[in-house]
């Protein structure tokens, strides 16, 4: 019997899933419940043959969502397995593991207690991740479950990279430091880029750019992360769809006073109303931004310039931090698909050893080398596959 692993990613109002056949690492079926706990909840299902279905279903909370997803997996019409007993284990995306987790682990009661203690670091995500784990526990007691942490890959950062220059007791008392996110993606693409280029991770200095609606960059030396752009929360670093990224702390207190905002109001402004959407007063989607900029919208053009510039700056900074640069990787929704972003970011970077080839850059969502043949630094596009990484980690821990 082939091993089958179910991957779950529970957000505050969504549950994404994928069922893997680990013999050939293929996706048997995948989908997601959306609007969990809200009116008009539904589940999207993608079958192995590529056919898509949308099913309206009332999902008041996560346990009901997981239960319904289980019923779809064994459904006589659209299911892909005869019985839930065919599932060997469940792998979960866990957002914030704090300093407690530097690798994927089997989710024992002890582990879950430690994870719960990290909840104030990710008050939206961690409780939702836990709900997914508890739902599986309730529905299929005894089924092995594995946690794969977004923060784990970045736990190799040295203190000089992760500490903030604030009173030290804030770190000791509350764990305030840089943690970084998208770690599973950075880990996957950094390893995959080496395979794709036929090089060893040892001795390679790489910058991985995970650019989606949320974005982060990591400096990876010898296959290990030494710095990353997101911080205590996913708000620091790059300019994003709705997040501000790097901003002067003094500007934050200034805005709070001017607008009479409390901490929650300020957090909402920086996380939900800033970034591309905040600057343009419109969409946070880079495709909309690109067409608006092309049609002469000044503010869209400014937002786009700022967005590209911030990525370019981080690549330069991390090349300095690593003392060199061998590979730049672009991944995630924008990184894999936006040709103009890659082109602008890599422009005028010859001094760093990046020689770009526009003719090779015309790719979307596929693995490709987009630097010139004689470029000292290789620039590649590697589509990320966090779910496969989670499934693989889960299999390896059984």
Language-model features and meaning:
Residues 268, 275-279, 286-321:
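Adenine-nucleotide phosphate-binding core of ATP-dependent small-molecule kinases
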Residues 153-256:
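Glycine-rich phosphate-binding loop of actin/hexokinase-like ATP-binding domains
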Residues 221, 227-262, 268, 332-363:
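Catalytic phosphate/nucleotide-handling subdomain of diverse soluble enzymes
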Residues 301, 305-321, 325, 335-398:
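Internal helix-turn-beta structural module
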Residues 5, 14-60, 231:
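Short glycine-rich, Thr/Ser-proximal phosphate-binding strand/loop in the N-terminal lobe
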Residues 11, 92-95, 211, 325, ...:
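Glycine-rich beta-strand-to-loop/alpha-helix junction loops that act as flexible
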Residues 73, 77-125, 146, 153-161:
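Short beta-strand-loop/turn "lid" adjacent to the catalytic site in phosphate-handling enzymes
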Residues 72-87, 193-200, 315-326:
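Phosphate/pyrophosphate-binding loops at sites that engage ATP/ADP/AMP, CoA/4′-phosphopantetheine
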